[in-house]
Protein backbone atom coordinates (compact mmCIF):
# COMPACT_ATOMS: atom_id res chain seq x y z
CA UNK A 1 0.00 0.00 0.00
CA UNK A 2 1.35 3.40 -0.90
CA UNK A 3 -0.91 5.41 1.41
CA UNK A 4 -2.71 4.53 4.62
CA UNK A 5 -5.88 6.57 5.08
CA UNK A 6 -7.38 6.75 8.54
CA UNK A 7 -11.14 7.31 8.58
CA UNK A 8 -12.31 9.58 11.42
CA UNK A 9 -16.07 9.46 11.83
CA UNK A 10 -18.38 12.23 12.96
CA UNK A 11 -20.64 12.34 16.00
CA UNK A 12 -22.72 9.16 16.28
CA UNK A 13 -20.67 7.62 13.45
CA UNK A 14 -18.52 4.52 13.59
CA UNK A 15 -15.18 3.28 12.27
CA UNK A 16 -17.08 0.75 10.13
CA UNK A 17 -18.01 3.65 7.82
CA UNK A 18 -14.44 3.34 6.48
CA UNK A 19 -15.74 0.49 4.33
CA UNK A 20 -17.53 3.01 2.08
CA UNK A 21 -14.21 4.58 1.08
CA UNK A 22 -12.22 1.45 0.30
CA UNK A 23 -13.82 1.01 -3.13
CA UNK A 24 -13.39 4.71 -3.91
CA UNK A 25 -9.69 4.77 -3.07
CA UNK A 26 -8.06 1.74 -4.68
CA UNK A 27 -4.40 1.37 -3.84
CA UNK A 28 -4.92 2.87 -0.39
CA UNK A 29 -5.44 1.02 2.84
CA UNK A 30 -8.42 2.62 4.61
CA UNK A 31 -8.63 2.00 8.36
CA UNK A 32 -11.49 3.11 10.62
CA UNK A 33 -10.31 4.85 13.81
CA UNK A 34 -12.50 3.88 16.77
CA UNK A 35 -11.99 6.92 18.97
CA UNK A 36 -13.82 7.73 22.19
CA UNK A 37 -13.10 11.49 22.52
CA UNK A 38 -16.10 13.74 23.08
CA UNK A 39 -14.18 17.02 23.29
CA UNK A 40 -11.30 18.56 21.33
CA UNK A 41 -8.96 18.31 24.34
CA UNK A 42 -9.69 14.59 24.67
CA UNK A 43 -9.15 14.21 20.92
CA UNK A 44 -5.74 15.90 21.20
CA UNK A 45 -4.48 13.13 23.46
CA UNK A 46 -6.25 10.19 21.86
CA UNK A 47 -5.61 11.10 18.22
CA UNK A 48 -1.97 12.01 18.83
CA UNK A 49 -1.35 8.70 20.59
CA UNK A 50 -2.94 6.73 17.73
CA UNK A 51 -1.16 8.60 14.91
CA UNK A 52 2.20 8.66 16.68
CA UNK A 53 1.87 4.89 17.15
CA UNK A 54 1.35 4.42 13.40
CA UNK A 55 4.32 6.63 12.59
CA UNK A 56 6.56 4.77 15.06
CA UNK A 57 5.66 1.46 13.38
CA UNK A 58 6.91 2.87 10.09
CA UNK A 59 3.56 2.73 8.33
CA UNK A 60 4.74 5.04 5.55
CA UNK A 61 2.56 7.85 4.24
CA UNK A 62 -0.52 8.53 6.33
CA UNK A 63 -3.57 10.52 5.27
CA UNK A 64 -6.99 11.05 6.79
CA UNK A 65 -10.61 10.99 5.75
CA UNK A 66 -12.67 12.86 8.31
CA UNK A 67 -16.36 13.57 8.62
CA UNK A 68 -18.05 16.50 10.42
CA UNK A 69 -16.79 16.92 14.01
CA UNK A 70 -14.15 14.27 13.27
CA UNK A 71 -12.52 16.78 10.91
CA UNK A 72 -12.51 19.45 13.62
CA UNK A 73 -10.98 17.04 16.13
CA UNK A 74 -8.37 16.00 13.56
CA UNK A 75 -7.39 19.61 12.88
CA UNK A 76 -7.08 20.29 16.62
CA UNK A 77 -5.08 17.16 17.37
CA UNK A 78 -2.96 16.55 14.29
CA UNK A 79 -2.02 19.97 12.93
CA UNK A 80 1.69 19.54 13.63
CA UNK A 81 1.97 15.97 12.39
CA UNK A 82 3.18 14.66 9.05
CA UNK A 83 -0.05 13.94 7.18
CA UNK A 84 0.21 13.46 3.42
CA UNK A 85 -3.35 14.46 2.53
CA UNK A 86 -6.74 15.06 4.13
CA UNK A 87 -10.20 14.44 2.72
CA UNK A 88 -12.95 16.19 4.69
CA UNK A 89 -16.64 15.43 4.25
CA UNK A 90 -18.96 18.21 5.52
CA UNK A 91 -16.34 19.26 8.05
CA UNK A 92 -16.97 21.44 11.03
CA UNK A 93 -14.14 23.92 10.63
CA UNK A 94 -15.06 26.54 13.23
CA UNK A 95 -16.80 25.19 16.31
CA UNK A 96 -17.41 28.69 17.67
CA UNK A 97 -19.45 29.78 14.66
CA UNK A 98 -21.84 26.87 14.21
CA UNK A 99 -25.29 28.29 13.63
CA UNK A 100 -27.72 27.44 16.42
CA UNK A 101 -25.10 25.95 18.77
CA UNK A 102 -24.08 27.60 22.02
CA UNK A 103 -20.80 26.35 23.43
CA UNK A 104 -20.37 25.85 27.15
CA UNK A 105 -17.65 27.93 28.80
CA UNK A 106 -15.05 25.15 28.69
CA UNK A 107 -15.49 24.53 24.95
CA UNK A 108 -15.52 28.24 24.17
CA UNK A 109 -12.32 28.80 26.14
CA UNK A 110 -10.63 25.89 24.38
CA UNK A 111 -11.61 27.08 20.89
CA UNK A 112 -10.37 30.60 21.59
CA UNK A 113 -7.10 29.49 23.19
CA UNK A 114 -6.27 26.88 20.53
CA UNK A 115 -6.65 28.40 17.07
CA UNK A 116 -6.27 25.85 14.30
CA UNK A 117 -3.21 26.12 12.07
CA UNK A 118 -3.88 23.42 9.46
CA UNK A 119 -1.22 23.15 6.73
CA UNK A 120 -2.11 19.78 5.23
CA UNK A 121 -3.17 19.47 1.56
CA UNK A 122 -6.93 19.11 2.01
CA UNK A 123 -9.87 18.26 -0.24
CA UNK A 124 -13.34 19.21 1.04
CA UNK A 125 -16.66 17.74 -0.04
CA UNK A 126 -19.85 19.32 1.26
CA UNK A 127 -23.45 19.66 0.17
CA UNK A 128 -25.03 22.78 -1.27
CA UNK A 129 -27.19 23.28 1.83
CA UNK A 130 -24.54 22.33 4.38
CA UNK A 131 -24.58 25.06 7.02
CA UNK A 132 -21.82 23.58 9.21
CA UNK A 133 -18.89 23.89 6.81
Residue ranges and their predicted role:
Residues 1-40:
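Short, surface-exposed "cap/lid" segments of acyl-processing enzymes
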Residues 13-14, 128-133:
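Acidic catalytic loop of the alpha/beta-hydrolase fold
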Residues 17, 37-56:
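Alpha/beta-hydrolase active-site loop
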Residues 35-38, 87-97:
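Active-site nucleophile loop of the alpha/beta-hydrolase fold
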Residues 61-64, 86:
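Conserved alpha/beta-hydrolase fold motif
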Residues 65-74:
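Gly/Ala-rich beta-loop-alpha elbow adjacent to hydrolase catalytic centers
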Residues 77-81:
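Aromatic pocket-lining residues of Rossmann-like dinucleotide-binding sites
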Residues 118, 124-126, 130:
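Short beta-strand/loop motif that positions the catalytic acidic residue
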Amino acid sequence: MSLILIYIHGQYGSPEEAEHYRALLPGCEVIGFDYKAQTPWEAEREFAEYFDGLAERGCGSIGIIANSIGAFYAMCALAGRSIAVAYFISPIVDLERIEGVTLDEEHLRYVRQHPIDWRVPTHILYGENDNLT
